[in-house]
Amino acid sequence: MRIPLLAPDNYAFPDPAYALAWCDGLVGVSGDLDAGRLLEAYRNGVFPWFSRDGWFFWYAVGPRAVIVPERLHVPRSLAKTLRNGSYRVAVNGCFAEVVAHCAAAARPNQDGTWIAPEFQTAYLKLHEMGHAHSFECHYPDESGETRLAGGFYGVQIGRVFYGESMFALQPDASKIAFACAVPFLADLGVELIDCQQDTEHMRRFGSELLPFADFAERLRMLNAVPLKEEIGRREVVCKGL
């Protein structure tokens, strides 16, 4: 198996179809995590999965788990929490803090996090460029002061939102953020949410699998279409009681 070494002065990626067929999805390895390379990766259905000894490993996953916003499913227990909870969901209020919490979150069957400091710096750059966004669920503490309880972040290009990572400091906080974010993104024009991997967690929200070729074609069409309105920073996307 030959793994392509990505040139530092060229952000083009090899065909992910070859990587899926012969390299377990490993598209290539780079010595950088530049914002331009990240954006080109997402446009092609590729994402950085981890780093080792200063090298970044880029993968494609197929079939691809996605959510079509109008087919979002909210589990019954979560719907009850959305109706009765005392939460507030905001957008881009504390992006760096959300990424840091995602990096610190314990993951089943993982010794550490893939969100190393280099990843945090790279996504913060995308945030400054207007491509990376965080959704934050806030809950009141014992004193009544509202505090960050959970959330997630991802990358937006055109009418596609690429989900990256979640965290929860209180039960259901990340789920609340996601359930509020999907219709909000749909209202702005997002037509596809990339979940990257097929997980039970995303299946509960109605994720479905697309063959990678179909997924890549959807990206080709939707990445080129601008949103109706920029995501921006919002203090309240939705809130409970």
UniProtKB/Swiss-Prot annotation:
It catalyses: N-terminal L-lysyl-[protein] + L-leucyl-tRNA(Leu) = N-terminal L-leucyl-L-lysyl-[protein] + tRNA(Leu) + H(+); N-terminal L-arginyl-[protein] + L-leucyl-tRNA(Leu) = N-terminal L-leucyl-L-arginyl-[protein] + tRNA(Leu) + H(+); L-phenylalanyl-tRNA(Phe) + an N-terminal L-alpha-aminoacyl-[protein] = an N-terminal L-phenylalanyl-L-alpha-aminoacyl-[protein] + tRNA(Phe). InterPro entries: Acyl_CoA_acyltransferase (IPR016181), Leu/Phe-tRNA_Trfase (IPR004616), Leu/Phe-tRNA_Trfase_C (IPR042203), Leu/Phe-tRNA_Trfase_N (IPR042221). Coiled coil: none annotated. It comes from the Bacteria. Signal peptide: none annotated. GO terms for biological process: protein catabolic process. GO terms for cellular component: cytoplasm. GO terms for molecular function: leucyl-tRNA--protein transferase activity. The keyword Cytoplasm applies. The keyword Transcription regulation does not apply. Keywords: Acyltransferase, Cytoplasm, Transferase. Its EC number is 2.3.2.6. It is found in: Cytoplasm. Functions in the N-end rule pathway of protein degradation where it conjugates Leu, Phe and, less efficiently, Met from aminoacyl-tRNAs to the N-termini of proteins containing an N-terminal arginine or lysine. Belongs to the L/F-transferase family. This is Leucyl/phenylalanyl-tRNA--protein transferase. It comes from Neisseria meningitidis serogroup C (strain 053442).
